[in-house]
């Protein structure tokens, strides 16, 4: 059940990040971040209140605050990468973020079984295959935005570690704390840089709202899952979000899916199945 929650979170992340990346091509990244994070904060706050989830106190939520800060920096890098590079390439590279949570699990003495290790290996191989773009002259190259995608991976790794630590007593309030931190940071940056948070067009607002709702929903699902299975396993399953992002980029934007990308996606999904079954 926990593995399914993590996979559902990956699906929500995939949709949310596609919406956020598409919106970032039409208005400033900071605008997308501030509004989407604000929408997500409002949504999860209402959910925490109506679910009668008791507030655990400030101190237990501090790791989630740190995680939220790392996460919004990761999202900023990801959306900027989407704006300057191909979504179908940038998204898979950013999925390297499970390395940090797996390392944290190792320090706790939590080691996946052999079947899960095999699945983790397949997921990573699939992600690498998705991340390589065939050059016209032959060979492979990393697309524009790859450096930003790597920064995004670092931010996402820090986010899931902080969220896991802050969700011990309440997953919902941990996400509230993380979202509050990300909204605060985005607004502060806007104030310091005198950046208007008004979108360039009202037509982009539905994309931004959808981004915030899907992204925050994913965070809640992943936070609940991390309370039931090791955070490293949750991270590996959550890292499958680029598969849906790539598919949406193909359907909506017409981005070409090479044979390597199709094989990479299939390998990653097979690996996720092994991780979940283990």
Regions found by a protein language model. Give the residues of each.
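Membrane-interface interhelical linkers
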Residues: 1-11, 19-20, 24-30, 35-66, ...
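Hydrophobic core positions of alpha-helical segments in small-molecule transporters
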Residues: 8, 35, 66, 93, ...
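Juxtamembrane C-cap of transmembrane helices in multi-pass membrane transport proteins
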Residues: 15-27, 76-85, 93, 106-107, ...
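Juxtamembrane helix-start motifs in multi-pass secondary transporters
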Residues: 32-33, 174-175, 234
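Alpha-helical transmembrane segments of compact multi-pass small-molecule transporters, enriched
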Residues: 38-44, 93-106, 181-185, 218-222, ...
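Hydrophobic transmembrane alpha-helices of multi-pass small-molecule transport proteins
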Residues: 39, 100, 115-133, 260-277
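Hydrophobic alpha-helical transmembrane segments in multi-pass integral membrane proteins
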Residues: 44-54, 101-116, 154-172, 214-232, ...
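C-terminal transmembrane-helix exit sites in multi-pass transporters
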Residues: 78, 97-118, 128, 189-193, ...
């Amino acid at each position: 059940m926990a593995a399914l929650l993590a996979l559902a979170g990956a699906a929500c992340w995939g949709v949310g990040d596609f919406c956020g990346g598409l919106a970032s091509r039409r208005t400033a990244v900071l605008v997308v971040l501030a509004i989407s994070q604000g929408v997500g904060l409002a949504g999860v706050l209402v959910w925490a209140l109506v679910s009668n989830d008791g507030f655990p106190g400030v101190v237990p939520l501090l790791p989630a605050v740190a995680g939220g800060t790392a996460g919004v920096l990761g999202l900023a890098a990801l959306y900027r990468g989407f704006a300057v590079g191909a979504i179908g390439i940038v998204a898979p590279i950013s999925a390297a973020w499970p390395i940090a949570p797996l390392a944290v699990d190792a320090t706790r003495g939590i080691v996946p079984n052999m079947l899960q290790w095999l699945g983790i290996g397949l997921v990573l191989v699939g992600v690498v295959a998705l991340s390589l773009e065939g050059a016209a002259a032959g060979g492979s190259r990393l697309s524009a935005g790859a450096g930003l995608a790597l920064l995004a991976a670092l931010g996402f790794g820090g986010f899931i570690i902080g969220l896991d630590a802050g969700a011990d007593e309440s997953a919902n309030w941990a996400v509230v704390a993380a979202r509050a931190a990300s909204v605060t940071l985005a607004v502060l940056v806007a104030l310091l840089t005198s950046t208007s948070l008004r979108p360039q067009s009202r037509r982009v607002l539905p994309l931004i709202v959808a981004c915030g709702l899907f992204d925050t929903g994913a965070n809640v699902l992943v936070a609940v899952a991390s309370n039931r299975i090791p955070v490293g396993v949750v991270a590996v399953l959550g890292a499958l979000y680029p598969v849906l992002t790539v598919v949406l980029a193909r359907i909506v934007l017409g981005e070409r899916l090479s044979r390597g990308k199709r094989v990479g996606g299939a390998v990653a999904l097979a690996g996720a199945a092994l991780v979940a079954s283990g």
